[in-house]
């Protein structure tokens, strides 16, 4: 049923309700895809609502990675507190430092790219 639906045919076989709802929200313009570029070159298409904050994006990245690991059987545990303590998310050279600030306030729109950049240590 889902495989034959043109709206949902891009979703994986072991799809979750959250992924179906995200895809529907995308189609209705209620959500956007942010392309998160990892340092190894992998691009993760992460779906967030239109008025999402930086914290919402971070949580969506965590959920995306968790689902991918469950499907592929990769590394079981990632210390996200370590990841966010060690790396910044950046967009067009600007660090996304404020978790409560909306993505649109940073100028991030649908299909924009966000990258990880290592934080410099404070002395």
UniProtKB/Swiss-Prot annotation:
Q: What is its main location?
A: nucleus
Q: Where in the cell is it found?
A: Nucleus
Q: Which Gene3D superfamilies match?
A: Phosphatidylinositol 3-kinase Catalytic Subunit, Chain A, domain 1
- Which terms in the GO cellular component ontology are assigned? nucleus; U12-type spliceosomal complex
**What InterPro entries does this protein's entry cite?**
SNRNP25, SNRNP25_ubiquitin, Ubiquitin-like_domsf
Ranges where the Ubiquitin-like domain occurs: 32-123
According to its UniProt entry, the protein's GO biological process terms are: mRNA splicing, via spliceosome
Assigned keywords, A-Z: mRNA processing, mRNA splicing, Nucleus, Spliceosome
State whether it acts alone or in a complex, and with which partners, per the record.
Component of the U11/U12 snRNPs that are part of the U12-type spliceosome.
Name of the molecule in the record? U11/U12 small nuclear ribonucleoprotein 25 kDa protein
**Which source organism does the UniProt entry give?**
Mus musculus (Mouse)
């Amino acid at each position: 049923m889902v495989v034959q639906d043109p709206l949902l045919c891009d979703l994986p076989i072991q799809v979750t309700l959250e992924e179906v709802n995200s895809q529907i929200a995308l189609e209705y313009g209620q959500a956007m895809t942010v392309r998160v570029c990892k340092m190894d070159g992998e691009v993760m298409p992460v779906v967030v609502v239109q008025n999402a904050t930086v914290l919402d994006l971070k949580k969506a990245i965590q959920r995306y990675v968790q689902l991918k690991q469950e499907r592929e059987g990769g590394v079981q545990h990632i210390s996200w507190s370590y990841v966010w303590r060690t790396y910044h998310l950046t967009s067009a050279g600007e660090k996304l430092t404020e978790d409560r600030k909306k993505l649109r306030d940073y100028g991030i729109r649908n299909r924009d790219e966000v990258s990880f950049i290592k934080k410099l240590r404070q002395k």
